[in-house]
Amino acid sequence: MEAPPVTTMPVSGGTINMMEYLLQGSILDQGLESLLHRLRGLCDNMEPETFADHESVYLLKGQQASPFVLRARRPLDRPGAPWHLRYLGQPEAGDRSRHTLVRNCVDIATSDVLPEFLQEMGFRMDHEFVARGHLFRKGVMKVAVYKVFRVLVAGAAEGAEPLSLSYLVELSAVAPAGQDNIADEVRGFAEQLRPLVQLEKIDPKRLM
């Protein structure tokens, strides 16, 4: 099995070949309302957007040690909306001094034949999950607060069960490469959410 889902920002208009600046954390279920109240006061949209997405993670194994990973996601709450294909690169080497995790992010809208296309290309589905939660915006930054649900029957998002008694919290911004000042903005906003949630740089390799 590949590592648990890392970053599950809701489906939205994606931008090709950009850098993602990311901090992550979690809160227990009982802390949700306090965090949402705090975010309403800090963010541009007083009431958060809600989202419910079904994501499948596909692997392509080759000669390299690590498989190539792509993520296919579809919104469950917006019938007819496009699927999205997402690639998340490895954290940039030498970014220890940066305040956030930094990695390449490719996000494109596709038709609903995406799963079949990936299988024809030789990918196999490793795991799938449902993410349901709230999305706030602050300038170029996004804050997603969501719960991950385990899919019990392959391909069927209905009846998915909560994976834990907590919510994941992701603070991110997507911008062209070289705009490292974005990392400072993300870290500064994260400081305003303490002590409700501790957002940190989490290297996906630590989860494997």
From Swiss-Prot:
GO terms for cellular component: mediator complex. InterPro entries: Mediator_Med18. GO terms for molecular function: transcription coregulator activity. Its main location: nucleus. Keywords: Activator, Nucleus, Transcription, Transcription regulation. Coiled coil: none annotated. GO terms for biological process: regulation of transcription by RNA polymerase II. Signal peptide: none annotated. It is found in: Nucleus. Component of the Mediator complex. Belongs to the Mediator complex subunit 18 family. Component of the Mediator complex, a coactivator involved in the regulated transcription of nearly all RNA polymerase II-dependent genes. Mediator functions as a bridge to convey information from gene-specific regulatory proteins to the basal RNA polymerase II transcription machinery. Mediator is recruited to promoters by direct interactions with regulatory proteins and serves as a scaffold for the assembly of a functional preinitiation complex with RNA polymerase II and the general transcription factors. PANTHER family: MEDIATOR OF RNA POLYMERASE II TRANSCRIPTION SUBUNIT 18 (PTHR13321:SF2), MEDIATOR OF RNA POLYMERASE II TRANSCRIPTION, SUBUNIT 18 (PTHR13321). This is Mediator of RNA polymerase II transcription subunit 18. It comes from Xenopus tropicalis (Western clawed frog). The gene is med18.
